[in-house]
Amino acid sequence: MSTLALIVEDDEDLASIFAEALHGVGFTVEHVTDGRSAEERLKKGDPPFLILLDMHIPHVSGGDLLVNVIKKEEHLAKTMVIITTADARMGETYGEMADFVLIKPISFVQLRDLTSRLKPKDA
């Protein structure tokens, strides 16, 4: 089973922290910085096991990406989604479409511990 995690985050420093936490528990990581790039990546190529999705990203919002791509593309049906946002109301709005909601600021340890529990056992 794939252990690919796609980080959709426009803050490069935060994306680096996320990538380090995911690498630390055995995930392979790809990173895109905006919704348009994420949409292109998700519509072609192998589906990731996990998407770490910032809700406030340029070009196509995380909410639009979640509603119009992630939840509509059949090949992404088994992809786990963790949304990240500093806006608790946005987390509530989209929370039912995601597997987890993390409210920023998110610590390295918090993300590492969560993703280590989500990683496929056979990976």
What kind of region is each of these model predictions?
Residues 54-56:
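Active-site residues of response regulator receiver
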Residues 58-60:
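The feature encodes the CheY-like receiver
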Residues 31-50:
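Acidic, metal-coordinating helix/loop segments flanking the phosphotransfer/catalytic sites
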Residues 116-123:
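The C-terminal output helix
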Residues 64-77:
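Short amphipathic alpha-helix used as the core "switch/output" element in two-component signaling
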